[in-house]
Regions:
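Glycine-rich, mobile lid/loop segments that gate access to catalytic sites or pores
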Residues: 140-244, 258, 262-263
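Well-ordered alpha-helical segments within folded domains of soluble proteins
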Residues: 128-136, 186-193, 239-244, 306-308, ...
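Terminal-appendage/accessory-domain detector
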Residues: 2-125, 223, 227-240, 247-499
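Well-ordered alpha-helical scaffold segments within catalytic/enzyme domains
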Residues: 67-68, 135-143, 191-198, 245-248, ...
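Hydrophobic face of alpha-helices
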Residues: 51, 55, 59, 131, ...
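Short helix-coil transition sites and intra-membrane helix breaks within transmembrane domains
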Residues: 123-128, 179-184, 299
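Function-dense linear segments that define catalytic or interfacial modules
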Residues: 99, 105-160, 164
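Short connector loops/turns at beta-strand edges and beta->alpha or beta->beta junctions
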Residues: 113, 130-133, 137-141, 160, ...
């Protein structure tokens, strides 16, 4: 979110402690406006840069689903459970092969998409994992869903997810109240995505959003201390709930109304605010897509907050020529909530036992970059987690906090909450001190990744598939994704990857 947007949020929340008549009027029919937008959005209405972004997100996300099948130990457990559930073979299980009912396919593919913590980010967490597995599960089940309709569904889902996040002080709220926005908002954004694939009308879409809302969950406790497998699975839960919401609405189930603005709606119950930014939520619907300014791709497979410290470590190597063998001490200075979350307990963060613990550790990930000059998927394998040089470097990492009010962490997404506010300082054995305070990170909108990098990332992830994928199918899938708007049946892509 821009600095202006963050300032507006603070001023607005400080200016009122009750619902004014103006605020009530501004929020009138907010849920219905979102439902109307989701039901009506068409491919031809989308700006070309947004179409390109959606295709990049598809390439990125599908590859990550496949790679997780052998790199994340929980993947096999979930796959065996889903397959044991049986049911109609409707939608593909990426990386493992086979099919499951659409809701279960959305559950496992949504879980797989976030397991490597390599997925793209935006305001509100990880919009792609909350929407793309849902869209493909529904597209395969329905059959004959065009690439253009799929893109429209993804665009509306991602936009609604982003708008919900930008209408509140998302970073501060999520940290203080303890919610994980990806899962929490994913029930509604995913329901909009699934509903658009199904072609729901406005009333059905409103019901779908209401059914999704009533399933909302996602506590940040799953990421405190030793990270639980549930952190990987958050978009699986919301994805399954989203499919359920859309399918029930299609069959006539009536959902809750006014789920955003109502007496017990999203703002009152989850955010506890009387003064959200209504214009950020419903202003210029269908004509303005702020995710074009905020969406970011990861070039390193770890928690978004580590992107800043990893960038700093990279800059120390490249700009100052700092060599691993010369480093005596490393100090990370950053905001209280973000830095503490990824640095405590320090003994566990320096010696992560699992892949997800390593990805959620500033000491370990910073050490990898300082020792190796890059951070890859292999650094979080069982072997990578035991690298003696990396562990020795992690032992030299300490951290200091800046109060959040001073660091300015309000608003923003993942790394955006710490860009320009986090410093990595190294002291060498000869007493010299070097520091880096990144103002941007690779993969952000202002520092975009190339299509070639995303293709290489896709191929690398696909090489870890539990069920081997023919190299020809991998290349054909890449071609189909770039040409998605011309596909008559978008489900061809996932079927090809599971052939």
């Amino acid at each position: 979110m821009t600095g202006t947007g963050k300032k507006i949020i603070k001023e607005t929340n400080a200016a009122a402690d009750h619902v004014t008549s103006e605020a009530a009027a501004a929020g009138k029919d907010a849920t219905r406006k979102l439902a109307r937008f989701a039901a009506a959005v068409r491919y031809d209405d989308l700006p070309k840069p947004l179409v390109k972004l959606m295709k990049q997100c598809v390439l990125d996300t599908l590859g990550l689903c496949i790679g997780a099948t052998t790199l994340a130990p929980e993947a096999k457990i979930i796959a065996s459970y889903v397959k044991a559930m049986g049911g109609h073979a409707q939608s593909s299980i990426l990386g493992f092969g086979g099919k499951a009912p659409a809701a279960w396919a959305a559950f496992i593919n949504g879980s797989l998409a976030h397991m490597l913590d390599y997925d793209s980010t935006g305001d509100g967490g990880h919009t792609s994992v909350a929407t793309i597995p849902v869209a493909f599960a529904m597209a395969e089940k329905s059959g004959g869903v065009s690439g253009r309709d799929l893109i429209a569904a993804l665009a509306c889902g991602a936009d609604i997810h982003t708008r919900l996040a930008q209408s509140v002080d998302i970073q501060e709220w999520a940290m203080v109240e303890g919610w994980l926005p990806t899962q929490l908002l994913g029930y509604v954004s995913g329901a909009a995505t699934a509903g658009r694939v199904l072609g729901l009308d406005e009333r059905q879409m409103e019901n779908a959003l209401g059914i999704g809302f009533n399933q909302m969950s996602g506590s940040r406790q799953m990421a405190v201390g030793e990270a639980a497998h549930l952190r990987s699975m958050q978009a699986g839960f919301s994805g399954q709930g989203a499919v359920l919401a859309a399918e029930l609405a299609e069959r006539g189930i009536i959902g809750s109304k006014e789920i955003i603005e109502g007496r017990y709606g999203f703002f009152k119950t989850y955010v506890r605010t009387e003064t959200p930014l209504w214009d950020a939520l419903t202003g210029r619907l269908g004509t303005y897509y702020s995710l074009l300014e905020t969406h970011a791709f990861k070039v390193w497979p770890a928690c978004g907050i580590t992107r800043v410290t990893t960038t700093a470590a990279s800059e120390l190597r490249e700009r100052f020529g700092v060599r691993a063998q010369d480093i005596e001490a490393i100090t990370v200075t950053g905001s209280l909530d973000a830095t503490r979350l990824l640095c405590e307990p320090m003994d566990r963060k320096r010696r992560p036992k699992t892949s997800i613990d390593g990805k959620y550790s500033i000491p370990f990930t910073t050490a990898v970059m300082l020792v190796k000059g890059n951070v890859t998927l292999r650094d979080y394998t069982a072997e990578g987690l035991q690298d003696p040089a990396v562990l020795a470097m992690a032992d030299r990492v300490t951290y200091r906090n800046i109060p959040d009010a001073d660091a300015g962490t309000e608003g923003g997404r993942g790394s955006a909450a710490t860009i320009g506010k986090t410093t990595v300082e190294v002291r060498t054995r000869d007493g010299k001190v070097y520091s880096s305070k990144p103002q941007s990170v690779p993969g952000d909108a202002e520092n975009p990744v190339s299509d070639e990098l995303l293709e290489a990332k896709f191929r690398d992830c696909a090489s870890f598939a539990a069920k081997n994928i023919n190299s020809g199918n991998i290349e054909r899938a890449i071609e189909m994704i770039w040409d998605l708007e011309n596909l008559a049946d978008a489900g061809e892509i996932t079927r090809l990857l599971c052939a």
